[in-house]
């Protein structure tokens, strides 16, 4: 607790933190806070998308800084979606950021989302793309994120889980060029897959609010 305060912001949104994330920091030097963002990881209620926007999360970070870390300033570390959130926090509260570390930078641009979820990455992983398309009828494939949203937020639990697993497996298998079983297992459980897919899709369809 006497170390330099640092807050770790995970990816997704919806991925949650893992014990491995602690290994990024020397516990002899840093007071480390791993923050499971709203609706995912150990946060409750799970898979909840109400009051779950970028700016709700920025407010959560600021509250954790004051009420948990008790720090005037802190380092903020984020990768992928975590980099988006870290940048949003740093722009909103620049005087509270001692250091900003971002990797795998993702800026939530329309071109990035379209490349990964509509057309682009599909050319690199054609076999996995077929699995991603499977829950969506051809008539709805002109806007895949919107089609997934209808299923992830619909009233049919079976359709929700089918969509959640397809969305999650697409991302976990394509997040690196070489297979990584740890990524594949991270959201294999039904509730973890639903939380990840619903929250991520919710954010992306709404362009991060």
Where in the sequence are the language-model features?
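Conserved HGGG/HGGXW glycine-rich cap/lid loop of the alpha/beta-hydrolase fold
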Residues: 2-45
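Conserved acidic catalytic loop of the alpha/beta-hydrolase fold
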Residues: 55-74
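Short beta-strand immediately N-terminal to the catalytic nucleophile in serine-hydrolase-like folds
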Residues: 76-78, 103
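Short glycine-enriched nucleophile-adjacent loop
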Residues: 83-94, 100
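An accessory alpha-helical subdomain
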Residues: 137-178
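Alpha/beta-hydrolase fold catalytic core
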Residues: 164-209
């Amino acid at each position: 607790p006497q170390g330099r305060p640092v807050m770790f912001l995970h990816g997704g949104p919806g991925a949650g933190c893992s014990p491995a994330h602690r290994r990024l920091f020397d516990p002899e030097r840093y007071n480390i806070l791993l923050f499971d963002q709203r609706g995912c990881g150990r946060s409750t209620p799970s898979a909840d998308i109400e009051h779950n926007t970028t700016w709700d999360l920025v407010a959560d970070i600021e509250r954790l800084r004051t009420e948990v870390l008790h720090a005037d300033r802190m380092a903020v570390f984020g990768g992928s979606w975590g980099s988006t959130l870290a940048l949003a926090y740093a722009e909103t509260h620049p005087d509270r950021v001692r250091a900003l570390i971002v990797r795998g930078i993702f800026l939530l641009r329309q071109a990035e989302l379209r490349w990964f979820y509509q057309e682009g990455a599909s050319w690199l992983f054609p076999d996995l793309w077929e699995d991603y398309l499977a829950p969506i009828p051809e008539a709805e494939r002109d806007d895949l994120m919107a089609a997934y949203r209808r299923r992830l937020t619909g009233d049919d639990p079976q359709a929700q889980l089918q969509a959640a697993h397809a969305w999650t497996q697409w991302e976990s298998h394509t997040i690196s060029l070489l297979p990584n079983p740890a990524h594949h297992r991270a959201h294999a459980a039904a509730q973890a897959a639903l939380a990840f897919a619903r929250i991520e899709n919710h954010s992306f369809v709404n362009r991060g609010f």
